[in-house]
Amino acid sequence: MKISDLLRLSTDNLRRRKGRTALTIIGVVVGTCAIVVMISLGIATNVNNEAMLASWGDLTQIQIYNYAYGATETPALNDEMLNQIRSLDHVVAVTPYYQPNDLNGKILSGKNGRYETGVWQCYGADPDALEKMGFDLADGTFFTSDMSLGKNKIPVMVGENFAYNFEDTRKSYNSGKRQIYQGQTDANGNLVQPFVDVNKDKMTLRLSYTDNNGKEKTQDYDLVVVGTFVSDYSKHYFTDSGMVMRLSDLKMLEEAYQKLSGTKKRQSQSYMISNGVMMQEKDNGYQEVYVKVDNVDN
């Protein structure tokens, strides 16, 4: 039997069973369309989920938080561990966001230090990693590890709304004029600018320690703003209201305060209870470390 005979036989059968043929064709078309629609819905769902997760933060960043209670076998999240992480494949950058446990001081600006804010919002980071971590700048540039501004001058980067942290110390705590808040407007609906222009006004970080006799010791450092972050809480809090300096500079300040106060680095006083046993937090390295990889699939 030739191929032409097979084709003729098939055609004749289809013509004799027109209803069945039509239903078969409709079934094939509907089934194909259903498969295409389901695949499309699956792809769209994946894309939507990835977009939703991306809105919460950078999917190529891994956050490592330090667990420092109890388990002695937990590796310390220190500089040695960070270097091991940097050596892994696909790792683009690694940096801790370091905050010392014991650093008493304030940031001053204005005549006679009229405007002030605390140092609790200061973080230390690896200067070679910040730009690679994908932070956006509203103004200025990233500081570098070899940047030198002179003796007792520290380059810093601030969040977009950092200036709103300053308070007017000449106003009472009950005064509505002691602090200007982000988004605050005047009677004409115009935005009220903060007391301090961080890009123009001088800012001084003052370490202070008061001994048992009530005598205060201080040491001052000039802060020079080299860059301002675009506010993005999905990347980190400090992009809005915090301050970042080089890790080495923050550790230098920590050592300077220890020398000023005559004390050693204070251990954390944090405790937790597990299985009825009270455990004190141990000094197990940095509190948080961020790792940037080259691709979300890695």
Give the predicted meaning of each segment.
Residues 1-36:
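N-terminal Sec/SRP start-transfer signal
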Residues 23, 118-119:
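N-terminal plastid-targeting presequences
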Residues 33-62:
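Alpha-helical transmembrane segments
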Residues 51-83, 87:
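N-terminal, intrinsically disordered, polar/charged segments of Gram-positive cell-envelope systems
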Residues 76-87, 92, 101-114, 120-124, ...:
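Basic-flanked hydrophobic alpha-helices used for secretion and membrane insertion
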Residues 98:
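Residues that line or immediately flank small-molecule/substrate-binding pockets and catalytic motifs
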